[in-house]
Amino acid sequence: MVQEAQGSKAPVQRIVDKVTGIFVPVVLGLSVLTFFIWMFFGGVDMLSHAMLSAVSVLVIACPCALGLATPTALMVGIGKAADHHILIKDAVALEQMRKVNVVVLDKTGTLTEGHPTVTGWLWAQPQEEHYKDVLLAAELKSEHPLAAAIVTALQEQEHIEPAALDSFESITGKGIKVSYQGTEYWAGSHKLLKDYHAALTDVLGEMLAQYESDSCSIIYFGRKNELLAIVAIKDQIKATSVEAVRELRTQGIDVYMLTGDGERTASSVAVRLGNIQYISDAMPDDKEEFVRQLQLQGKTVAMVGDGINDSQALACADVSIAMGKGTDIAMDVAMVTLMTSDLLLLPKAFNLSRQTVRLIHQNLFWAFIYNLIGIPIAAGLLYPINGLLLNPMLASAAMAFSSVSVVLNSLRLRY
């Protein structure tokens, strides 16, 4: 993947290729023009001067420096990113990243550790033996990380075995529903709770608020229109998340958090991250719509997620960034993949993009300046002033030096 990315072309490289395609015939024309000017105005040694100057123009002109300016910088930039566990899919992604002014972060698995654990159970109804068996069987079929936390907690308890379910259905962005012995059970977010019109008692509401203020995600478990239990699950915020958000802000990038959690939980997490802006109760469609709204405002948006309930938003973002532990969908869609859970790689990736593009511009600038100055000197512009006529051997040395200088300038990025 790294080799493919290093061999890809950035948009600026396509422009340079067109310029180089024009540059070569122009240089040939200038060489011929130089020859005839010397033949007409060269005086006694006009033939030797004409030959030397025409050859020097051909030799000193260096499309190589122009051609090397972009790919050498890209190869070094993408290689350095890989050294830091940042995989960049192609040169377009590397160049696009420098334009990003808004980063949208999914919460679970991106800002948090991705290792949720159950911290509490609140039973709204007297427990029956099969309730936990049904919940275990249902969550075993779910791919959501919160489901894994419930499965782990239930499996640690004695005498709980997965029930034989009649059916299973995943409800995108809300949860799951199953059938057991002809009765429908469900587990998911408070949106699913509302869909089933299940009541929440005042006592449960107060206890629930305490869990939410502690940044816990809440899973509701019910039967038909009856709430059976509430499961509080906590996923610790990564140690690097706060610092990563701070660095992104330092780079002038606005940061948003999207989460399917309720308002209180989302607010609690946002405060801990430094009072970042957030959207709570976000369904997959809501996340995609939010990214599109930012784009309509003229923003260049990077979406960072693990592919669970955010693959649509990843697909429509200007720059899609997947966490290394994300889903296969996220990996396929993502233009950039952070191979570790360290969120500090995110500001580092944006900074590396800006450094690489800045280096490309430097290389192109000096390549153009070299040709702009070198070709007239090779043609004999200084001869009437100080008698200097450039030897073709010196012209070839200057040409080689220009190419080497571009490569050396690109290699600076590694250190």
Region annotations inferred by a language model:
Residues M1-V2, P63-K80, K107, L111-G120, ...:
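Conserved cytosolic headpiece of P-type ATPases
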Residues L52, C62-A138, L294, A313, ...:
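Conserved catalytic phosphorylation-site environment of P-type ATPases
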Residues E4, S8, I88, Y180-G182, ...:
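Conserved ATP-binding TGD loop and adjacent catalytic N/P-domain core of P-type ATPases
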Residues L30, A334, M339-Y415:
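Membrane-embedded transport module
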Residues M1-A54, I237-K238, L352-L359:
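Actuator/coupling domain of P-type ATPases
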Residues I15, G29, G42-A61, A69, ...:
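Membrane-water interface of transmembrane alpha-helices in multipass transporters/channels
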Residues A69-G79, T117-G120, A149-A153, A315, ...:
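Re-entrant/interfacial helical elements at transmembrane boundaries that shape
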Residues L146, Q155-S268, M283:
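Signature of the cytosolic headpiece of P-type E1-E2 ATPases
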